[in-house]
């Protein structure tokens, strides 16, 4: 996979050069191409913004240097722009993007874009209902979520299958040694060696965590009869705990 990023601050993307993603680049599993669109400005001092037509506070990033930077790319693929008005990024989008050969992200900073910049993009995407100083951090988050799904990036392919959101549920609790830490014990079922019981416990706990923290995910889910039974049991267990109080 080849990922292009148009940005005024390419140095911000250093974190993508380390850990699993950095190793993935070294192994040739993906490539990051950082393009400073300031280099495509033909104005004095390489300026890339100007005052808005019609007046108003602040400055607006110009379309020409960004368009010229895009045109310089050999393989653009899907063009994505980070914007508060975009649809919210999620795991399904990461999975879809991970199947692309080329992706291009456009990052703003401080100012908004000339409206014609948005017309250059195939998708407008946000990471949440809040405002940041630029699009670099959202872009890094989306790149991380996408690239980690590529074959060979994670050591264990099952890791991407069993973790939160991959099947529409939050992840079940996990434990490692010691089995007893200051009186806090690992659930006995995980020590039993009975993989059928362990799978059932994990499914139950994933449903329980999702019901508690992200009930909206359950509303979108086509529940199996077994999940309906488990959720009924979860409600009964919760009621029993309340009755003890």
Curated annotation (Swiss-Prot):
It is found in: Cytoplasm. One of its GO terms (biological process) is tRNA N1-guanine methylation. InterPro entries: Alpha/beta_knot_MTases, tRNA_m1G_MeTrfase_C_sf, tRNA_m1G_MeTrfase_TrmD, tRNA_m1G_MTases_N, tRNA_MeTrfase_TRMD/TRM10. It is an enzyme of class 2 (transferase). It comes from Lactobacillus delbrueckii subsp. bulgaricus (strain ATCC 11842 / DSM 20081 / BCRC 10696 / JCM 1002 / NBRC 13953 / NCIMB 11778 / NCTC 12712 / WDCM 00102 / Lb 14). Specifically methylates guanosine-37 in various tRNAs. S-adenosyl-L-methionine binds at residues 108, 127-132. Pfam families: tRNA_m1G_MT (PF01746). Keywords: Cytoplasm, Methyltransferase, S-adenosyl-L-methionine, Transferase, tRNA processing. This is tRNA (guanine-N(1)-)-methyltransferase. HAMAP family: TrmD. GO terms for molecular function: tRNA (guanine(37)-N1)-methyltransferase activity. Its EC number is 2.1.1.228. It catalyses: guanosine(37) in tRNA + S-adenosyl-L-methionine = N(1)-methylguanosine(37) in tRNA + S-adenosyl-L-homocysteine + H(+). GO terms for cellular component: cytosol. CDD domains: TrmD-like. Belongs to the RNA methyltransferase TrmD family. Homodimer.
